[in-house]
Each structure stands twice: as C-alpha cells, then as structure tokens.
C-alpha cells in the first residue's frame, strides 16, 4: 500500500513538472516588425518617431537569435518607436543604401534634419551610420539604452 501511494505521488509530481513550463501563447506579447521597401517609407516614419532598423536574413543563425530580443523591445516601445526589419536578401537595394555587409546589423535613426539622418551613438547623435551600427548578435541592454537615447534626443 505504501508503494502505491509513493508511486502515485511521484506520478502526480512528474505530471505537474511536465506541464509547469507550458503557457498559453495568446498571453505572450509579440510584436511584428514593419517591413519597408524604400527610403521614403523610412522618411515617413521618422516624421512621427525614431526608427529602429534591424537588417538580417532568415539564413543567418545570429539573426534568428536576435529576433526575439528585438520583438520584446518592439512590444515594450512600439507606441514610441517604429521597429523595422529589412531582409537583406529581399531588399538588397536598401541594404546597399545603408552599407550593410554583415548581419545582423542594427541601428536607430533618431531624426532627419534637411534629409540627413541623425543616428544614435553612445548617447549622442551622429551622421556617421557606420559608427552607429551594432553588428552581430546584440543583447537587450545596449539596444534598450540606444532606444531610450533616441527618445531623449528626438
């Protein structure tokens, strides 16, 4: 009898552990990043808010790892910042416009002054897009700091 109680207790415990990690995906916050086809679309977005741009490709392992980090930030700041994903394989002209050679490549444009983009770099603005790039897998902390800087500098 004691063995049956022990086995039953272990079985119930195993089932509880098995299902403890399951969650309902409908409660998870996910934010789809916008896609753009032209510089003009980016310019239109800049009229109302900073633009966070991630350049990547589905074939890139680091880009796949970057995606949930950016989606989490997009869910948090979507009402204050435009989040854009540009697939370099599909939009190679935009990748060339921003001199993208390595992916993922992330940068934030705070504003445009007389047609010149002002990128966020270390808490300040720069017109040098190369210096403002975050190339490779970038953790949430530096990305969030850059977003907050863009909002402050806007």
List PLM regions with ranges.
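Secretory targeting signatures
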Residues: 1-27
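The canonical Cys-X-X-Cys-His
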Residues: 60-63, 106
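Aromatic-flanked redox-active Cys/Sec active sites in thiol-based oxidoreductases
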Residues: 54-60
């Amino acid at each position: 009898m004691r063995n049956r109680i022990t086995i039953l207790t272990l079985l119930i415990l195993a089932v509880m552990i098995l299902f403890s990690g399951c969650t309902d995906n409908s409660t998870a916050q996910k934010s789809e990043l916008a896609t753009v086809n032209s510089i003009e679309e980016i310019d239109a977005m800049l009229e109302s808010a900073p633009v966070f741009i991630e350049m990547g490709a589905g074939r890139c392992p680091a880009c796949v790892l970057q995606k949930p980090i950016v989606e989490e930030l997009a869910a948090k700041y979507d009402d204050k910042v435009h989040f854009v994903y540009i697939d370099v394989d599909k939009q190679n002209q935009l990748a060339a416009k921003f001199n993208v050679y390595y992916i993922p490549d992330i940068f934030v444009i705070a504003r445009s002054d007389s047609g010149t983009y002002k990128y966020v770099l270390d808490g300040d603005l720069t017109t040098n897009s190369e210096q403002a790039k975050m190339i490779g897998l970038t953790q949430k902390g530096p990305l969030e700091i850059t977003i907050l800087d863009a909002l402050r500098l806007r």
